[in-house]
Amino acid sequence: YESHWDKEKKQPRSKSVMAFGYVHELISDEIPDPVAYYTDFVAEKNKERAAAFTEETRPRAFVAPVEYNLGQFLLYTLLEELNVKEVIDILAAQMRFQFRIYDMIAQLIFSRIIYPCSKSKTVSSVFPHLYNSSPISEDQVYDGLSFIGGSYKKYIELFNHCYEQHYQRDFSNVFFDCTNYYFEIDLPYEDKQKGPSKENRHDPIIGQALLLDADLVPVAMQMYPGNESEKPYIRKVIEEMKSRYKVSGKTVQVADKGLNCARNIYAAVKEANDGYIFSKSIHGRNLSEKEKKWLLLENEQNIWKDYRDKDGNLLYRLKSCVDSFSYQFKEIDPETGRDVVKTFSVKEKRIVSYNPALAKKQKAEIQKMADKAANYATYKAMTREDLGDSAKYVKITNKDKNGKKITPVIGIDKEKVNEDLKYAGYNLMVTSEL
């Protein structure tokens, strides 16, 4: 039998592909056990059919396409103007590739603009549709990327040099950001390490830092180990990239709350005379009670500006303030070797937004996590792996009113649930750029 999904009836259906007959009629000297024989027969036919289906549906990288994409001509002209082809071919000459590295780079750039997708799908589904493209296989793309990745800074310097022959760089402000990527490795190696990603996973990741000029044209890029904290690394990377590429302008660090810490703000504003645009967490102890109260406040001094669609439905709300805010952080005194607390203040603009659609989504997620946490009635039945993010709503009481140890009692942290529900839909941005 063969099963398939019936779209009209919206249910699985089966059809007979081949009938063998009754067991007692199939018994013979050649087939003493028809059940075992035809079980193996069906398994073999299924393998053949699966192999044939895979071959029929496998994307062909070099099949002549019916239509071509022409949208890359603007970028094609820019690459031709930069005149990097000859130098790139010289850099790759030692490898004796059966394809041109420049052609691979150009086609990957064009494909990223036309239809961003995985490298495998790019080769099979996008390359063939590029007008006047070169036939480059998936294996060749990975070989070429591995070669470029070993000395990627050379290529960045080449493109920077050629770009500056034609265009004036604006370094009055430069922007910095970093992110990380998940990838597959058997063992950690150099900058490929296991560490926490933005999705709170601890799978192998690698970090990437990017520096842009005032026109948002990339200046520098640097990879760093995924098991290193981004917070101290941001300072090191900015210093290295600005020094390497002779950038003297003010750097505005743009980052999410993962990089927002007092030490980075101090390094940006006080040490380097730079700026920052950070998102800031509104939960936990990141904000004082006074600051949290301001988020929800609406009066003559705290006016929200509403943005609505053409039908009058609220899309989002914004309000802002400018004030001096105090920060503090611990660092080791180089002379005594002891921890010292450094306190400083900075004039900062804070922008808070409220999105009703986001609030609805977050409230549903909070309620779902709270309900999940409520299902664990005993301490033994509860593990952090089972709870996941719901663990933050679990309250464990292991002492009585007199401070005496008791059997752990599991409960819901209603105060935490109510606080998260109250601030659902709100986001906070802080910046030195007034």
Residue ranges and their predicted role:
Residues 85, 89-434:
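Anion-binding and metal-coordination hotspots
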Residues 1-103:
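Conserved glycine(s) in the ABC-transporter nucleotide-binding domain "signature"
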